[in-house]
Amino acid sequence: MVGVVSDDQDFLDSKDTMKMAVVLVTPLGNGDLALKFGYPTPHGGCQKMDTTFTEGAVPGQFSNPAMALSDIRVAFSDYQHFALLYLEMRKGGLRNQWLQLYGGRAAGRRPRHPRFGSGMSPLCLHQPFLHAEGGTAGSWCLWPRVPAPPCPSLPLFAPPAPSL
């Protein structure tokens, strides 16, 4: 992950002391995404969490009510070098927006999508993981629904229109 911006007050209060998480995303055959998170704890441990992002009505859109994420979208990406993700969270009666910028590309063999095989190029996103036992890397992949040129440029602080 290259950068994160949000209007979430909890994030703003703790962003200076946060460490990067590792996220492994696995596309499921039904269109959902299985996610495994690993968060470094202050005492050198690792907190793990598994969850599923449920595919929405619009291709490329997901949600996870358990995490209060009502809208997760790939706002802009070239599906090779970078992705800008838009996330909307609703908690305590407030609506918070997040933008997460990812960069990088998977090295070696191209991953295989369960429905599309290896004929489509994913964007593989790497997140450094700061852990007491040494650095490891996590990665996850975003798969385009159909081969398409990059999305048109969108304003950074407005919710993106469906584009996939």
UniProtKB/Swiss-Prot annotation:
Superkingdom of the organism of origin: Eukaryota
Family listed: Belongs to the calycin superfamily. Lipocalin family.
GO molecular function terms listed in the Swiss-Prot or TrEMBL record: small molecule binding
Protein encoded by which gene: LCNL1
Organism: Homo sapiens (Human)
Protein name: Lipocalin-like 1 protein
